[in-house]
Structure formats: structure tokens, C-alpha cells
Amino acid sequence: MKTLVTLLALTLAIPAFAQTEIKVDSPAPAFSVKDASGKAHSLADAKGKWVVLEWYNKDCPYVRKHYDSKNMQGLQTKYMAQGVTWYTVISSATGKQGFLGNADVAPNFTKEGAKPTAVLIDTDGAMGKAYGAKTTPHMYVINPEGKVVYAGAID
């Protein structure tokens, strides 16, 4: 009986830890996440603007493809020139693949030639979980009304 109760409790608890999957046309989840310098950035900061959220992992071969070809930097430049807010998000936990410490962020992105609005450090993964970001580069485009109009891969 004790085993059955434990099994039931675990079964009921699993959905509580599942990631949310954001659907197109749904409101974008609010966030407030700090960059490497400690400055907080939020979705509310970009209210009334287009926003791109780009999940980044320096060791991901698909991220490498887009950064080594300068594709991602070109998109950042093009759309930011049109007033888009571009947040690059690092959700890698300390010591895990793709992790960048605060002191490593600026040199890494200078080397990449990338100039997003800000690089957000989501080491606890809360923002990634709120958006359901599972891979890199995982992209979300949010319209000025705060709705997700694209969610998925860049290719």
C-alpha cells in the first residue's frame, strides 16, 4: 500500500515539473532576468515593441552553424535597426554544457560579433521553463501586443 501511495504521489507530481509549451497567439510569459552585469531586463521593458528571444548555447552545433556563418549576427543587426528588442538567453546551469560565467559573456559575444539588446543569464532555467525552450537555438517572436507569433527553431 505504501508503494502504491508513493507511486500515485509521484505520478501526480510529474505534471507540476513539466515545461510549459507556448503556443502561437498566446500571451508571452512575463519575465525579469538579469544580464551579466546584473541589470534586470523584462518583457515589460519592451512593451509595444517587437521582441525576439533567442536561446543560445555556445557549444551547440546548430548555434555554431548560425554564428559561424554570421547568419544570427546579420539577423540581429537587421531587425534591431528596425526597432526590435533582441534578447539572447543563456539557460545553461553552472558547470553544464554551454555555461558562461558573467565575466565570460562579454568576451564571448565580442568574439562572436553579436550585439543583441542584452544577453540574459537564466542559470536557474526559470525563463526557459516558462517558455518551454528545449533546444538551441530556440526562437520566440513576440508582437507589440505581447503575443507569441513564432515559437520554434530558426531553420
What spans do the regions from the language model cover?
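Short, internal strand/loop/helix patches
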Residues: A106-N143, V148-V149
